[in-house]
């Protein structure tokens, strides 16, 4: 008699057991898929933070959990979103108080980005903004210093909304502010929670050394 190690179902022949695929076995076979791995990572983090579990959850715990499907679904969302500061995003979602089945929400991620960029240090914001500009230049066969001169308004809207171009950067560059003026009303409404003029005016006033750092980088890089 041959028994499935996952569902404990008995089979008379080994060949029948080999082709048998129960739900737990299917989950086990998919353990190396990217979205499953992401879901498993978040599952472990959830029990560490929310349940204050001292014992690290295993993959066997994961595939037998009633929450497996929900975590894998979020794993797909996480992998596709490619969030900035991934660990911070996971912790943010877990501590948000939002129910697990509602984690795959663009609105929740937008809220995370909007709050995050107002808190992060200027140097991290600068590095990510320049990286985004370089990626754009590689795609367009251009130079990254010309990003604000030639970027498509839709692309600029996306990059700001996703936190890829920070207000630390765009609001301290003349061509950046000019690029914002090319956005239409709908696009301005989309980037509004990120480009919060009153907030950033106070921020720049309170952190003059960071503003000077940005201006030095702009001057040295000859951003146009």
Task: Report each predicted region and the residues it spans.
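C-terminal recognition-helix end and immediately following basic linker
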Residues: 1-40
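Charged/polar, solvent-exposed surface patches and flexible loops
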Residues: 19, 23, 41, 45-49, ...
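Short, low-complexity intrinsically disordered segments
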Residues: 29, 45, 101, 134, ...
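Charged, amphipathic alpha-helical linkers/stalks
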Residues: 29-72
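Surface-exposed polar/charged interaction patches
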Residues: 46-49, 53, 77-84, 95-99, ...
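Extended alpha-helical scaffolding regions
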Residues: 59-137
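Long, mid-chain structured domain cores
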Residues: 107-177, 182-183
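Charge-dense, extended regions
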Residues: 149-224
């Amino acid at each position: 008699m041959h028994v499935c190690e996952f569902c404990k179902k008995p089979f008379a022949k080994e060949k029948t057991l080999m082709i048998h695929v129960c739900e737990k076995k299917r989950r086990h076979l998919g353990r190396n898929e990217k979205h499953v791995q992401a879901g498993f990572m978040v599952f472990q983090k959830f029990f560490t933070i929310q349940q204050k579990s001292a014992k690290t959850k295993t993959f066997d715990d994961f595939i037998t959990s009633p929450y497996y499907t929900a975590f894998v679904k979020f794993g797909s969302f996480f992998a596709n979103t490619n969030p900035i500061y991934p660990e911070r995003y996971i912790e943010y979602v877990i501590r948000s108080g939002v129910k697990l089945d509602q984690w795959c929400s663009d609105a929740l991620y937008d809220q995370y980005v909007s709050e995050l960029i107002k808190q992060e240090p200027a140097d991290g914001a600068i590095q990510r903004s320049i990286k985004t500009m370089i990626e754009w230049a590689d795609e367009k066969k251009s130079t990254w210093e010309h990003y604000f001169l030639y970027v498509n308004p839709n692309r600029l809207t996306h990059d700001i909304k996703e936190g890829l171009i920070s207000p630390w950067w765009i609001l301290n560059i003349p061509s950046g502010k000019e690029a914002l003026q090319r956005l239409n009303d709908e696009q301005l409404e989309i980037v509004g929670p990120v480009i919060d003029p009153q907030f950033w005016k106070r921020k720049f006033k309170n952190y003059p050394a960071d503003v000077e750092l940005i201006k030095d980088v702009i001057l040295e890089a000859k951003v146009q």
